Swiss-Prot record:
Effect on the protein of changing residue 219 to A: Impaired phosphorylation by cds1/check2, leading to stalled fork reversing
Transmembrane segments: none
GO annotation terms (biological process): double-strand break repair via homologous recombination; Okazaki fragment processing involved in mitotic DNA replication; removal of RNA primer involved in mitotic DNA replication; replication fork processing; replication fork reversal; response to intra-S DNA damage checkpoint signaling; telomere maintenance
Annotated binding of [4Fe-4S] cluster, by residue: 450, 679, 682, 688
Keyword Ribonucleoprotein: no
Protein name as annotated: DNA replication ATP-dependent helicase/nuclease dna2
Region: Helicase activity, residue numbers: 809-1397
Cofactor: [4Fe-4S] cluster
Gene3D superfamilies: 2.40.30.270, 3.90.320.10, P-loop containing nucleotide triphosphate hydrolases (3.40.50.300)
Nuclease activity: region residues: 390-808
Function recorded in the entry: Key enzyme involved in DNA replication and DNA repair. Involved in Okazaki fragments processing by cleaving long flaps that escape fen1: flaps that are longer than 27 nucleotides are coated by replication protein A complex (RPA), leading to recruit dna2 which cleaves the flap until it is too short to bind RPA and becomes a substrate for fen1. Is a target of the intra-S phase checkpoint, associating with stalled replication forks when phosphorylated at Ser-219 and preventing the stalled replication forks from reversing.
Catalysed reactions, as listed in the record: ATP + H2O = ADP + phosphate + H(+)
Gene coding for it: dna2
Amino acid sequence: MFNDQSKTTSSVKGICATTDNNHGNLKKTNSTPFRKNYLLNGRTKLKLENFAYNASTEISSPKISEKKHSSLPIKRKNTFNESSTSFSPFTKAHKEITDDLKPDKSFTRKSDLNSQDMPVCFQETSKDLCRSSSTQHLLDHQTTDSTIIDMKPVSTNSKSDVFTLYTDETVLLRRCASDNKPLINNNLSSSNVSENQSRSFGSYDEVKNQGNNLHKVPSLVSIIRNARSSEQSRIAANSSCLLKGSDTEIDEDDFALEAEDLAALDSLERQYSQLPNSTVTASAKDIEKTAKVNHVGGDLQSYCSATKASDATINEEPVNLALDKACNSLPDINSDFIDDWDDSCDGCTPGELCEFSSEYTVLEVHEDFIFHEGNHFRQLKLILEANDILHQLFLRGDWTETSIFVGDSIRVEATFDKDNTAIVDNDKGLIIIHPKILMSATAVASSFPCLRKAVISDRVGIYGPPTKAMVTGNILHDFFQHALYRGIDALENVDINLETSIKTYISDIYFADLSLDEIREELDARLPLLKSIVERYLISKKNDNNNESIHISRLLDIEESIWSPRFGLKGNIDATVEVVLTEKPESSSTLTLPLELKTGRYVDNISHFAQSLLYTLLISDRYGINTNQALLCYLENSTIKNLVASNSQLRGLIMTRNSLAQHNFRRSLPEMISNRKICDHCSLVSECLFFQKMSDKGVANSNGLTESWNEWMREVKDEDLEFYKKWEKLLNQEERLLLLKRGDVLTFDTEELEAYGKTLYPLYITKEDIVCLEIDDRVFHYKFAFLNDNGYPRNFLHSGFSVGERVFISDEHGHWSLAKGHIVHIQDSCIEVRTRHRLHIPWLKMPNFDFKKNQVFFGNYEDSKLSFIGSNHTRYRIDKDEFSSGIASIRGTLMSSVLPDAPLIIRDMIIRLKPPKFCNSALIDPEFLKCLNEDQITALKKCHAAEHYSLILGMPGTGKTTTISSLIRSLLAKKKKILLTSFTHLAVDNILIKLKGCDSTIVRLGSPHKIHPLVKEFCLTEGTTFDDLASLKHFYEDPQIVACSSLGVYHSIFNKRKFDYCIIDEASQIPLPICLGPLQLAEKFVLVGDHYQLPPLVKNSRTSKDGLSLSLFKLLSEKHPEAVTTLRLQYRMNEDINSLSSELIYGGNLVCGSKTISQKKLILPKAHLSDGLPDSSSSLHWVNKLINPSHSVIFFNTDDILGVESKTNNILENHTEAFLIEQAVSSFLERGVKQSSIGIISIYKSQVELLSKNLKSFTEIEINTVDRYQGRDKDIILISFVRSNSKNLVGELLRDWHRLNVALSRAKVKCIMFGSLSTLSSSNIVSHLLKLLEKNKWIFTLNENDIATKFDENSSPIKDCSQVATTNNAKVIIRKNQRFFNSDNLCEKAILPQLEF
C-alpha cells in the first residue's frame, strides 16, 4: 500500500526506485547489489551455455519503427494507487507470504538494464502484464514494499495503423514453485563483476547468428533457482516434524554460486541487456490458430532453447475500445447462481470426464487478447510443467477471471494435443487450482451469496452449543437413512426407533438446553412429512397412486465420505442410491446418484442446489461414471427434486471452489460485500468486522453495521490488537506448512511417505469384525497385513504408527478415505483399525451394469457379495490423518481473548502482563502437606495465596505429579471447582491415577481409546447410557474436577461450566495461544512446567524462531519471577547422573532429594557372570566399563572404530552405534537386568526405528526419541548421538540444549552414551558436556579390537583388525561405505568395499 500519494519508494528484489504516481515513470536510483547464495552447479552452467548458444534457429533482428505515435492507455481493473480495491483480498496474504518466504532483504541486485534498451514486443504483452485482471493487484502491491511498474511505449508495425501500447518494461516472473514464493521482479544484472572474472561469450552479432535466446535467460535462471529452493522446502517440510529423525540440515552442502558460475551468468546478463528493442507483427486466421502460437512440447531444456514469443492479432479498432469491450463482455462467475436457478440443462451437457490428469506447476502466466469475428477477447496463457515436460494452456471465457499465480499447482481436465497445448473455455474443460487443498462441498456451497463468510468459517473455529434445529435434523437424518436401508419395514415401530434415536442424541439435547418433550413435539410434527417421502419415493414402484418419475430402488451407502483430489473437493453424502428415473412410460434408466436431505424450513435455497451438484463430481470420481444429476430431498414439502447440472453451473461451482482454495492457500480474505440486509443476519458478523479492523482498511466505510461495532471495540486497546496480530501471523505461518504437508499425503510416492512414517502400503485385509449398535449403527474392526511382493518381511511395530492414532484408509486405485478410524492394536505382523464405516469396493459393478442405462453396483449393504473383502485382490493403504490441525479453534480463542467481553485475567495478566498479586497468608490443612518436601510445601502455599496465578518450575524428577495431586486435594477441601489439563493425555491420566480414591468425583473428557485404562471409569464410553436428562446433568455438572487435554476444551460442557482454578501440567510444552482456551474458563490458574526442558513442538522451524515456540510459562516466569516456586529436590537420579543436568543446565540448583537416592547404584541379579571378565588390557574392556555398577555415567567414543553415520534421502542412521547398543543390551540381559528397566534414546527417529528393528525380539525395552521420553524414566538409559562425519556437522537438534537436558535426565542409575567425540565437540552445548565427562574421566575410547574379536568367524562384521587398512585414503573409503550388519541378521557379514591404496 502507498503511504504517500505523490511519491513512493519501492524496493523489489534488486530494483530501488522512486516513482511519481501522477506519471507512472520509474526512475532508478543507486542501490547496493548483493547476491543471493543460490546453488548453480556445473550442470546448471552447461544449461546456461547451451541455452545461450543454441544454433537450431537463426533469428534476424527486426527493424525498429522510428515513427512516434501517441499512447493509448490500456483499460485495467486495477490502478497503481491506494484506492485500488479490485481483488485486493489477496494483497495482504501475498505480503505475509513474502515476509515469510522471501530471501533476506539485503540480497538485492542492481539492474543495469536501461529502460530505453529493454527488448519488448507486442506478442510478449502477456509476459509483461503477467497477470489476469483478477490478480494484477499482486504486481500493483508486490512484496513488502509497494511496487510501481514502469509503463513505457512499445511500437508495433502493422500494415494497418501503427499504434503504441503501454506495457511493463521490467517484469519477468520467476517460477515460485511449491514453496509459495510470491511474484517478484527478476531483474538480472552484471554489475560489480569485473571483466577478468567473466568469460567472453562473443559479440552480440555472434550470439544473434547462433540463435537469439538470451532474452529467455532470466526465466531459465529462475527455474533452476527455484527447483533447488522448492526441493529444499519440501525436504524441510517433511523433516521439520522430526520424522525419520532428520534435523533439516539441508544446507550442509554449500548453496552458493561459484565464481565461474557468477562470471558466466553475468556475461549472459550483460549480453541480454545489450539486445535491441524489436517489433514483430503476427496474424491469425481464426481463434484456434491464435491459441497454438507456441510449440512448448519437450522438456525444460527445449523450453529454454526453443520457446518463441506468443502471437497476437490486432486490427484497426482502437485498442482502448477493444479492451473495454473484452473486459466488459466477461460474465460474472456467480451469474449462474441467481434466484432464477435453472435445474434443466442449458443445451450443452457435460461431456465424458477426461482421464485423470496430472498435476502441473504454473511457470508463467501471460495475459493477451485474441481477435475473433471482429472482436477482441481476453485470454490467459499458462506455461505449465509436469515431470519435466512443458505444456501450454489457454484459458478463455469465464476462466480468464481465475486468480492464478506463478508457482500454483493445478489440475487440468482437458485434452492436450501433440504439441502439448490445450484450451479451457466455457464449452469444454476445467482447471482445479491447488487440488491438494480439499474444499468441502458444504463450504463451497455456503459461499453464496458471501464468499467472505465461507472463508472466515474455515479460518476461525466457532464452537457453540448445538441448536434445536441441529438436534432434530440429526435425528431425522438417522431415521431417513434407516428408511432407505429398511424400506417399508422402517415405518413399523416408529415410536420405538424414535425413542432409541433420542437416547443416542441425549447429550446434544442436554447441551442445547432442550427438554425431551420439546424434541418429541418437534419430531412428531415432522415425522409424517418423512413418512410421506418414504411412501412416495421408496416403497413399491408399482403403487396404484404412484405417478412419480423418481423411484429410489436401492441404497448403496450412507454418509459416504469422498475425497477427490481430482476436483479438489471432499464431502459426506447423506446417501448414495440407485434411482430408477422414468422419463416416459416406456423408457426408464437406473442411475447411481447422490441424495441430500434438508430438514430445515427453507426450500429452494441456492446453497442447497450448489451442494447437491458438487456431489455429482464426487460420485463421478468415486464410482468411475459420468453423472450430472443429483437428488435433493426437502422434508418441509415432502418432495425430491432431480437436479441436472449444466456446464455453466459446474463451471461456476468449480471457479468458486478455486477462489476458496486460493484464499485458503494464501491466508487471505475476500472483500466485504457491504450488504446490510445480509450482514444483519450473519452469524459471523463480529468475526468479519474484526478481521476488517485488523486489515489496513479498517471498518469505517464497510457498511451500516460499523457504528455500534466501533463503539463496542473502543474498549479494546492497541496493545490488545498488537497481541492478536503477532500471534495470528505465527499461526498463519504454521498453518501454511501444515496445509502443504496434508496435501503431500495425496500426491507423494508411497515409498517416500513410508520413509517418513506417514503411510503403510501395500496392505490387504485379513479379518473383518462387525459390532452392531443401536438401530443400524455398526462398528467395524479390520486387521491388515503387509502384502510382501518382494518377500522382504516388514514389521508394523517399527512403522512409525502407534495405538490411538487417527488414520484413514484408501485403496491403490486412488479412492481416498474409504473409511476413517483409529488404531486399536499393533503387532509385528498385523495392525487393527476401528472404523464406523464399512470398507467396500465402490467401483465393483454388477454383471448387468451399463454406463448410461443401468448403473448398478454391489454397494455397502450387499453382505452376500462381500466375500471378496478378505482377498488379496485389492491393495489398501493406511495414512495418518493429519487433516485436522485445530488451528482454526486456536485462532478463534485468540480472537475472543482480545474482544471486550474477554475475561480480565486474560487481558490483564497475559496480554498486558500486569504483575500477579498474592495474599499474606493462606490456610492449608496440614494433612495435605504430609510427605511433601520444603519446596513442594512452599509451592502449595503460594498457589493458595495467589489472587491471579502461580507458577511451579519442576526440574527433572522433582515430583511435579505428586505436587499437583496434593494441590488438587487441598483445593477440593475448600470446595473449589478445578479444570485439569495438560499437553498430553498421559500426563492428565497420571495425575488422575494419584487422585483415585478421593472423595470428589471426576469427569474425564476425551476419546476413550486415548485414555488410560485405569481412569476410563471417569469418562463416557459407548456402553454408557442415560435414561433421562437429570442423570446426564449429574454426570457433567456435579464433579468438582473436569480433566482433558489442552485441546479438549472445545467440548460443549464448557459452555455450561466455569471453574475456580485451572491447573495446566506440562505448561512449558504448550504454545501460548493454546493455553488461552483453558484459562478463559477459570478465575485463577496454576502453570506447572520446566522451560529448561523441551519447548512447545512447532512444525515450522521459521515460525518457531519467530516465537510460536514461546510458552506462556516461560513468558510469565521471565517477566514475573516472583510468581515462580522452584522444585529443586529430585528423587530419580543418583549423584553422578544428577550432576550432568545440574551443572550444565541448572547452575547446580538440582540436587538429590536424599542420601539413598544419591548413592543408588545398578544391581546385577547375575553379577557372578561378570567375575570372569578380562582386565583392562583385554579387547573387551569396554564391556567391563559398561556393566560396572560403579560407573554410573560413561561415554563411549567411536572415533577410532570408523563409526560414521549414513545419510540417505535425508535419513540419518549410525549402524555402528546401533551395533554397540545391541551388544550392551545383551550384556545387561545376560546378567539378569529386566527388559523393562532398559530404555534407549536417540535424537533421530530414523535411528530409533533402526534400533527397534534390530532389537525387535526384546518387546519390553522402550526405544524412543527424546521428545517421547519427556516425563519418563528408566534404571538404565542408552543414548545414541548418531552424528559422526568428517565435516564435524552435528545438525540443529544437537545444538538444542533443551533436548540434551531431557536425554541426560531420564536414567536412574546408569546413563550410557555412544558418539563421536570429534564430531560432537563442534556443538557448543555438547562440548560442555564432553568437558564435564572428561573432567570426571567418564569417557572411554573404543578401538577396533573392542569389536573385531568379539565374534567368531561366522558372525564377525570385521573378522580381524588386519582387514581394516590403516592409510588415510582407505579409512575415508571405509567410513563412507561402512555397514556393519543387515537389519534382519545382526551377525551377517558386511561386504567390505574395494580399498584403493
